[in-house]
Amino acid sequence: MSSQVIPALPKTFSSSLDLWREKNDQLVRQAKQLTRDSRPSLRRQQSAQDTLEGLRELLLTLQGLPAAVPALPLELTVLCNCIILRASLVQAFTEDLTQDLQRGLERVLEAQHHLEPKSQQGLKELWHSVLSASSLPPELLPALHCLASLQAVFWMSTDHLEDLTLLLQTLNGSQTQSSEDLLLLLKSWSPPAEESPAPLILQDAESLRDVLLTAFACRQGFQELITGSLPHAQSNLHEAASGLCPPSVLVQVYTALGACLRKMGNPQRALLYLTEALKVGTTCALPLLEASRVYRQLGDRAAELESLELLVEALSATHSSETFKSLIEVELLLPQPDPASPLHCGTQSQAKHLLASRCLQTGRAEDAAEHYLDLLAMLLGGSETRFSPPTSSLGPCIPELCLEAAAALIQAGRALDALTVCEELLNRTSSLLPKMSSLWENARKRAKELPCCPVWVSATHLLQGQAWSQLKAQKEALSEFSQCLELLFRTLPEDKEQGSDCEQKCRSDVALKQLRVAALISRGLEWVASGQDTKALSDFLLSVQICPGNRDGSFYLLQTLKRLDRKNEASAFWREAHSQLPLEDAAGSLPLYLETCLSWIHPPNREAFLEEFGTSVLESCVL
């Protein structure tokens, strides 16, 4: 690029430039001082806002003059300082920042008389016009590269990666056909150094380039972790860890590396990275959550639950206000983790639920019951609006939490407490149910409005029946199981692809069938306990008709037929059942409360009995 002759400055203008530069330098020092300010957050924020206003006023003064090359380095530097401080204050890149960038580029073209009147060029076109100008003065390059780095930051944060690639190719002097590897382009970019004396800048182009480099490596690594490109994710995450990585981001990177190694089948190495993440010390929630997953993979239940307990504590701790950031840092360029990402930590209540559910699943019913009660106390707070149908897929909805809590209480032998939870749930959901007389006619219409409500109420009656059964109150248990079945046989399955994860599990055809089977077998067992085998037989037979191949139902049906001395019917049923394909395991696709209910009716000697019965049938056939 050839330099152009710069006319001598009038003495008064030169003096004004010196004053304006001093003003810029003073404001920059003021902004940097705020990072060491120990005053309360609101006062620091106000001071930063005042500094930004000072920079904006200075910028308006400079932009109010005719565009001139001698003043442009200062003007562009002030513009960069405004953008950096503004983005730091709001911790985001708002759309109006593009107007500032556009105005800065237009001023560069105006100074060189290259801007056409009433030009409507976009940012891409303006950058091309500025950077391809043959007469671009060298003294403008440092400030222009800083402005370009802010443009790069904006485009990365808004996922305009093609525009960013083209800009970097132009800055590197590359042709369009050259490398499109953003990581390589960022490494190749070497912003020119400022010549002394130059106006102070909050963050120069080289610093911003390093931020971009680390942020892009993080973004790529995190995304590849989600999509399953684990070797590429590992490579990018190592790149990020070796770069300009602030502590909060380093925790995420080490945790992501741990998740990557866990998925690659290296849990022990994963723990090493998670230990490093904990040593960084800014936040321990994320590595603790990942550690619980690693310990679960290793089968170390005690360590898994301990990690989850520490996670709940970590998320409940109050954090002191962070120091003010007057710079653009890597965090600003990282999107919020997707709920499906291993880097999504969630809230304290979500962590508490995870702990409670894992306690229930691993046989620690007493602990599970206490955790569920704590969780419900935390979430409910007297608000009935939380019992509306779920709208997100982030874990179970409140009614399902109540059902899980009741199941945990029954499992822990606390039937009366379980009844209390169930009564509370019924009180809060009864107003959402249509009247029984009109339920059948309105089933389809109501299913669209309140798709899970009939299932919630049915499951509540099932759990109440189990609680009464534990208390040896057969009459009440039979009544609850019957109410459950009456409602269930009026409930229609829904499209499993619609709604949240909570809705899909509770409304699926498989879930409804299993819920009916659980209620029928539970009622049948109460009939058996009261000596009414004929009524029990009817329920057991209906359960295997609903779910052909269900081995629990088959066990109870065969036992009852045997007790009633109906051996021929039992043999015929066994032969028919034996010819059917085994029922697929529905575990994992069912709500946790239902899995727990099904575990209660699962006879421990089922397989031995069925095998022995089958052998006797075959022997009788031979004879």
UniProtKB/Swiss-Prot annotation:
Q: Which GO terms describe its cellular component?
A: chromatin; Fanconi anaemia nuclear complex; mitochondrion; nuclear speck
The entry's keywords: DNA damage, DNA repair, Nucleus, Repeat, TPR repeat
Q: Name one GO biological process term.
A: interstrand cross-link repair
Superkingdom per UniProt: Eukaryota
Which cellular compartments is it found in?
Nucleus
* TPR repeat coordinates: 251-284, 349-382, 458-491, 517-550
Hey, what tissues is this thing expressed in?
Highest expression levels in spleen, thymus and testis.
Q: What is its main location?
A: nucleus
Q: How does it assemble?
A: Belongs to the multisubunit FA complex composed of FANCA, FANCB, FANCC, FANCE, FANCF, FANCG, FANCL/PHF9 and FANCM. In complex with FANCF, FANCA and FANCL, but not with FANCC, nor FANCE, interacts with HES1; this interaction may be essential for the stability and nuclear localization of FA core complex proteins. The complex with FANCC and FANCG may also include EIF2AK2 and HSP70.
Instruction: Say what the protein does.
Output: DNA repair protein that may operate in a postreplication repair or a cell cycle checkpoint function. May be implicated in interstrand DNA cross-link repair and in the maintenance of normal chromosome stability. Candidate tumor suppressor gene.
Which PANTHER family is this protein grouped with?
FANCONI ANEMIA GROUP G PROTEIN, FANCONI ANEMIA GROUP G PROTEIN FAMILY MEMBER
* Protein name from the UniProt record: Fanconi anemia group G protein homolog
Q: Source gene?
A: Fancg
